[in-house]
């Protein structure tokens, strides 16, 4: 699909065509324009805020679970690679995902007391199969560790073009207890705030076909916000 960035990278470009095939097939059956609307896949997200013994935040440990359909396609593609087993394919895929995400700031924005924070480079990561889902785990460091006491840290994780939707892990229609966690000091209140996009932006996303790219930054308006407020 021309012009659509995907974190899985160029090594799996063929996978993008599956979204087109699925959309066209369903659309021809249901005659629904919504099938072609963005987003075309999703990631279930969970985040652990990493702090040291002094209660200083050093980064975010993120776990991404790709949606079941996309996961199935990825596993089938990897198993067809000759001379390589699934785990070897996943190891290479993890490297590809990391390299492609680095060009997009790992789909992550972090603010402390409203001030944007510079991010470090990801060196710890892994891709694996878990319960039939492609799961990518990585530690995203802050370029400068930040004390949390008396401050508020917020983050958003989103695909800038909104081709993929990123949502925190849910349970009974609300963020699960494991969607955002922080162990140790300081004492903080954790919450996940829902997105509240302008109706015009919702319509804009709905009008985008599967082979079209939303303007950069569109995904920010649909992003949930993780908030850590510390005493």
Please report, for each region that a protein language model flagged, where it lies by residue.
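Sec-dependent N-terminal signal peptides
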Residues: 19-26
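Structured domain cores in non-transmembrane regions
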Residues: 69-148
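Boundary at the C-terminal end of the N-terminal hydrophobic targeting segment
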Residues: 35-37
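Early extracytoplasmic/domain-onset interaction patches
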Residues: 39-72
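N-terminal secretory signal peptides that target proteins for export/translocation
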Residues: 1-15
